Amino acid sequence: MADIKYKRVILKLSGEALAGDKGFGINPPVLKDVAKELKEVHDLGVQIAIVVGGGNMWRGVTGAELGMERAQADYIGMLATIMNALSLQDALESIGVPTRVQTSIEMRQIAEPYIRRKAIRHLEKDRIVIFAGGTGSPYFSTDTTAALRAAEINADAILMGKNGVDGVYSADPNKVKDATKFDHLTHMDIIEKNLHVMDTTASSLSMDNHIPLVVFNLNTSGNIMKVVTGQEVGTTIEGD
């Protein structure tokens, strides 16, 4: 059995990652692949919590284009994350992985409300927990949600799965050919160099609570397993 570096993790999944090449909505083959990889890691004994974004369904810029109030647009985004969470729950349970969805906005007919102690108990009972609805408040990103929940459940690390990007670069590698990839950074590097890995609130939360962050390409099969077993994948961000 492989050695486990991170026993309890938060996986931050962007909505775009679930859309895959489609760019919008949910791509069923991608969803199935993610679920299969998560099952392999879960079967290893790793406790997994997931924070999902909603960018494949709704973008804040869309609300701005409509002249919508920021708070209203953010609430729509929260609902988008819940749709993604329920889809991922179904994909996981269809392959035998017990999964619970907890939402920061109560909707008891379809999910549990977020309760910290209950979430931890689910993890201890080897259930995957998906946190949906962001923080439940507008003006906070799902990156901030990941950092907040990681601190609350005492996660060993935040795993940030990116769509087609294999780590943190000095510039957008899709636009700048000679962009430099970083293997290791500190949380302060992210803030000072304005590297746009997470927003400043999320980076500060991670730094203050000493939570490592690993940024990696979700589209490469086996990467989640490599990260939790301590193999060199993507970019590791830790320390002040």
UniProtKB/Swiss-Prot annotation:
The keyword Cell membrane does not apply. GO terms for molecular function: ATP binding; UMP kinase activity. Its EC number is 2.7.4.22. SUPFAM superfamilies: Carbamate kinase-like. It catalyses: UMP + ATP = UDP + ADP. Pathway: Pyrimidine metabolism; CTP biosynthesis via de novo pathway; UDP from UMP (UMPK route): step 1/1. Residues 20-25 are annotated as: Involved in allosteric activation by GTP. Allosterically activated by GTP. Inhibited by UTP. Pfam families: AA_kinase. It is an enzyme of class 2 (transferase). ATP binds at residues 12-15, 55, 59, 163, 169, 172. It comes from the Bacteria. It is found in: Cytoplasm. Belongs to the UMP kinase family. Catalyzes the reversible phosphorylation of UMP to UDP. Homohexamer. This is Uridylate kinase. It comes from Limosilactobacillus reuteri (strain DSM 20016). The gene is pyrH.
